[in-house]
């Protein structure tokens, strides 16, 4: 590892736990990323795409009716307004540009809710790259609008039936494919997890979320928020929001994991609070495991949070106490999904609804003037059929 240019660890978490065949590919990727970060032409092209293709900066919206407490302002960082419908587009454009810079012709990706797959498909269509997306068969069934969008933009969507047929299995299949094709293909990982250098690359390409939020808050309120809140699955939208605030001790960083049917049941996806450290997906990180060390299946109503591990920087922020991690159940997320629609005319992704749920709960308990910012990581179009079925009493 002495030849690496960046630290592969966040405290004890992270690393590059991959088959030897992939080590040269990861080192090549790290070198290309470091060089691109120092290349003014690359940075200018990335910035131009974010502004003139994706639609940045995104709005910072002060909610009018959501807060249950007159002393508490709740702002929404509107990543739902980004082209593609979620924060995923930020880092996908960055990685796709990086892949072209490296001379790759093909992109391999995994997706859960389909948002990363859609973002990858649009970036590949734009930049003339072949696109292959692995998606758990369960997620293909519950996210049909996004599957159609991907195929419409020219992507090949491959349903994965192994294991639990969800995101972790799609990740494994994508990594397996890449191990045999990395000379021509780039694995465009969709979250701030996996082997080094992916957690660092994804954070840096998502950092724009927190940078804009900080600038917008200073313009609007003349000060920084008291807390920033984001949902956490793998953790890319949250680390994008947190990154520029980590060195601002007055700003509390709050991640919200999916409590599913309840933290006291096996049906959740909260490895930070209820997992044990292990090796998974090329990294050392908190992991949902049984008593024999086998990976337990995670569960969440939201496909994008249905992941049994979490990014290593979140694990480190949790271990050091710089960030705190809470959870919201399916029922709480469903209530927040409906509440935001009724109160503000904004339909959030079910993933983002977990963060909304916690923000409303926190606001209710505040006893002084407080400003909260929630990262509204995506829009809820993809979830309306799932929510409709649940509200109509159907099993999902």
Swiss-Prot record:
The keyword DNA-binding does not apply. The keyword Amino-acid biosynthesis applies. Disulfide bonds: none annotated. Its EC number is 4.2.1.20. Pathway: Amino-acid biosynthesis; L-tryptophan biosynthesis; L-tryptophan from chorismate: step 5/5. One of its GO terms (cellular component) is cytoplasm. SUPFAM superfamilies: Tryptophan synthase beta subunit-like PLP-dependent enzymes. InterPro entries: Trp_synth_b_CS, Trp_synth_beta, Trp_synth_beta/beta-like, TrpB-like_PALP, TrpB-like_PALP_sf. The modification N6-(pyridoxal phosphate)lysine is found at residue 88. It catalyses: (1S,2R)-1-C-(indol-3-yl)glycerol 3-phosphate + L-serine = D-glyceraldehyde 3-phosphate + L-tryptophan + H2O. It holds the Pfam family PALP. Its cofactor is pyridoxal 5'-phosphate. It comes from the Bacteria. Tetramer of two alpha and two beta chains. The beta subunit is responsible for the synthesis of L-tryptophan from indole and L-serine. Belongs to the TrpB family. This is Tryptophan synthase beta chain. It comes from Shewanella putrefaciens (strain CN-32 / ATCC BAA-453).
